[in-house]
């Protein structure tokens, strides 16, 4: 099996940019540039002409617009992997699918245990179920050849399925009032995309135009606009009659943009948590605790436990060349929720300050802790495993 090295390069370096963007957001929000930072996020931008225009603050252009492009890339990746990649065979997809399922269920249960008595707080149950593929892969790539490529493939595949779960959750649970007219327009756009796909049209401009109309209609429909990106991606043809792959071409063109620009910008506008006057009792509220323990404990235990049972029942095997200790280390890294958790958080609470930023702080602290612990754990046990192999060879 071969891992997509170009994707990993984009995602791992993107992780470094995410860290820088997060630090800058915290410095801006808690320094002398606080007012400037807040005004930037609230600044209204209008796109369109005459009566046909959209006006939104910058933060919503990022969350609804740029993130739709990110999910479009996720959709392209999913389609390619399903047709000819790591998700094309049941034997390849079984273990990461079961692991991803455990990584959604247990964090949600932990969050529910902390917040089941609060109707508003419980809206955030999906926050600790997400994994940030850029950060998780970035940490894993820092370990280089100490980690078998099969484990990198496992984490990459699990993260892809995790993204798919997030898409389904957003579509079902974070939808507002629905607009029938907007749904009709969206349906027409989907039919147009189907026709383009059926005749294997390879002009990017045709897909871009229809997808833009689809995005606006979905935005107005009440369903979150990022869903438009995923759905549109599945209509991009894998190959035309000449053998050219528009899907691979678009994925290649947009990977760098999403990893080096969109996700860092998203982190910058969403990770600016004010620490002024923050007290320990605020950090220990039910939402902050549910998110923190859901990500840090729920993700790693859920992924490992479901995978362990599945393997012991004989339905799957450990990734080739890996040990149980290394496998558990990768499970720890799934607790890095960061950008995906922040995104779900923005949908659940609409950037409310109801919890004194304990929600965002819980995400940042849990993601940072999972990354550090996972890296140190894998560094130690990978060296132990390597030395053990050398001793056996001698």
UniProtKB/Swiss-Prot annotation:
GO biological process, one term: regulation of pH
Location in the cell: Cell inner membrane
Bilayer topology annotation: Multi-pass membrane protein
Molecular function terms from GO: sodium:proton antiporter activity
Catalytic reaction list: Na(+)(in) + 2 H(+)(out) = Na(+)(out) + 2 H(+)(in)
Superkingdom field: Bacteria
GO CC annotations on file: plasma membrane
Keywords attached to this entry: Antiport, Cell inner membrane, Cell membrane, Ion transport, Membrane, Sodium, Sodium transport, Transmembrane, Transmembrane helix, Transport
InterPro entries in UniProt: Na/H_antiporter_dom_sf, NhaA
Transmembrane segments: 13-33, 58-78, 93-113, 124-144, 153-173, 176-196, 208-228, 260-280, 291-311, 327-347, 361-381
A family per Pfam: Na_H_antiport_1
PANTHER family linked to this entry: NA(+)_H(+) ANTIPORTER NHAA (PTHR30341:SF0), SODIUM ION/PROTON ANTIPORTER NHAA-RELATED (PTHR30341)
Purpose: Na(+)/H(+) antiporter that extrudes sodium in exchange for external protons.
Family designation: Belongs to the NhaA Na(+)/H(+) (TC 2.A.33) antiporter family.
Name of this chain's protein: Na(+)/H(+) antiporter NhaA 2
Gene (name only): nhaA2
